[in-house]
Amino acid sequence: MEEKSVQPSYRNPRVRRWASYLWREAIVKSWGPIAPAFAKPNPAKWSNAQITAAWLGHSTVLINFFGINILTDPVLFPRIGIRIPFLFTIGPKRLTAPALTVDELPRIDIVLLSHAHFDHIDWRTLRHLSRRGGAKADFCPSVKVVTAPHTRDLLRWTTLRDVTELPWGKRKSFHTAAGDIDIVAVRVKHWGARMQHDNHRGYNGYLIERNGRRILFAGDTAFTDTFAQLRECGPIDLATFSIGAYNPWIASHASPEQAVQMANDAGARFIMPVHHQTFRLSFEPFREPIERFEAALQNQPERIALREIGETFVLPD
């Protein structure tokens, strides 16, 4: 049975009050400084014989999957929201800087986009990614983009042209300069509209497979029992789950405890918590998501891949 979209309705007065409060908070916070990332990854030193992943902030994860470089939901500028061309962006400002800038990224082979929300598809980052070093830099035709159904049009403002929309349950093999990789679109419980009235857009998680290893990038999701079905694909070595923005958006964002449960349902060996400590998108305190996540795994702390923005995880043999 398909998960139904859980898009909040602005006809609901509670939703309007929450949105207004968070908007005011975003404006107030915009006057404050942006804290530095906890650590700075060094992808140049990563081995192509291993699986290495670094959390760059929010849902942006840089993965070296046996030599194939994958970037999830790249958002690497100080602010998200509606961009006024050549001027500024209207929307929430980062609380913590990204661990790497666009120009500090290594060669990217594949970009995974989970859904169309402004904190997951960021035009400014994608434009810079497709023209590394600025508008006069050479076009990067080798970057492959995998995205949810009915979101391809959002990339027309970039020079990224190798775009695949992947519906739930669909598997596709991709060839890169470093070899081949399989990606499966995973059903999640969320919503895909970028604005209020384009709710036809899809929303995905992704299972990535190469050399007998599997990584799950769950994107944004509320609690759902569908991840248990992934056990049929084989063991999952690393699962990346969002753990923030659950208060009051629990209908579309899992709590830390629910994220752990879904990772357990999927049979994940290690869990990487993301989507926290970056933007003010909800009411929970800044450190609450990671503290609750650690508490949920207090008997298995060795399964926590990382905790802070900029940390790097190397998958053990």
Each model region followed by its residue ranges:
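Short amphipathic alpha-helix with an adjacent loop that forms part of the alpha/beta core around
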Residues: A99-P106, K172-A178, H197, A228-C233, ...
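Di-metal (Zn2+ and/or Mg2+/Mn2+) metal-binding site signature of metallo-dependent hydrolases
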Residues: A97-G133, P149, L154
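Divalent metal-coordination and catalytic microenvironments
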Residues: I63, D73, H115, D122, ...
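Active-site metal-binding loops of divalent metal-dependent hydrolases
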Residues: P74-L76, A116, V186-H190, D220-T221, ...
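Metallo-beta-lactamase
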Residues: M1-R107, A137-S142, T147-F217, D237-F241, E291-D317
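Cap/insert and terminal regions of metallo-dependent hydrolase folds
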Residues: E2-Y10, V143-V146, H150-D153, F223-I309
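Short, conserved loop/helix-junction motifs that constitute active-site signature segments
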Residues: E104-P106, R127-P141, E232-P235, M262-G267
